[in-house]
């Protein structure tokens, strides 16, 4: 299994995790004890990271399947203790899944751009589909200026380039 340090040394993974949990979260990962399970309070004490930050980081990682917990109930008090461990071995799969989701959204946006004809109000800078523009007799509903045809080819070209780059990075071009 790859260590946290090795994972964080990868610029793409570091950027992804940094965006997800911030600098303090990264600091928690760097100081996270290897092996075993630890409560959020133990982690805060062992790492010197604020307890609220520890909890927020763990929940965020859990939402992405990069951390797991086991729940223990104290039979005397009824209190629950959550014992956490990292699952950063899943980071590549999680990243790929998110890239595929982004690709799906970009494909849908490209289809929308290619399927529709657009009109724009130069005064308000609002873009409308042909259907909406026709419903308003090609007058802006905000300022009543005439709508002009909007050429969205640059948007479509940019979307195609981005889609091609993503597919290439996924090995499915």
From Swiss-Prot:
Residues 9-92 form the HTH TFE/IIEalpha-type domain. GO terms for biological process: regulation of DNA-templated transcription; transcription initiation at RNA polymerase II promoter. PROSITE patterns: HTH_TFE_IIE (PS51344). GO terms for molecular function: DNA binding. The keyword Transcription regulation applies. Gene3D superfamilies: Winged helix-like DNA-binding domain superfamily/Winged helix DNA-binding domain. Disulfide bonds: none annotated. SMART domains: TFIIE. The keyword Transcription regulation applies. SUPFAM superfamilies: Winged helix' DNA-binding domain. Pfam families: TFIIE_alpha. InterPro entries: TF_E_archaea, TFE, TFIIE/TFIIEa_HTH, TFIIE_asu, TFIIEa/SarR/Rpc3_HTH_dom, WH-like_DNA-bd_sf, WH_DNA-bd_sf. It comes from the Archaea. Keywords: DNA-binding, Transcription, Transcription regulation. Monomer. Interaction with RNA polymerase subunits RpoF and RpoE is necessary for Tfe stimulatory transcription activity. Able to interact with Tbp and RNA polymerase in the absence of DNA promoter. Interacts both with the preinitiation and elongation complexes. Belongs to the TFE family. Transcription factor that plays a role in the activation of archaeal genes transcribed by RNA polymerase. Facilitates transcription initiation by enhancing TATA-box recognition by TATA-box-binding protein (Tbp), and transcription factor B (Tfb) and RNA polymerase recruitment. Not absolutely required for transcription in vitro, but particularly important in cases where Tbp or Tfb function is not optimal. It dynamically alters the nucleic acid-binding properties of RNA polymerases by stabilizing the initiation complex and destabilizing elongation complexes. The winged helix domain is involved in binding to DNA in the preinitiation complex. This is Transcription factor E. It comes from Methanoculleus marisnigri (strain ATCC 35101 / DSM 1498 / JR1). The lineage of its organism: Archaea, Methanobacteriati, Methanobacteriota, Stenosarchaea group, Methanomicrobia.
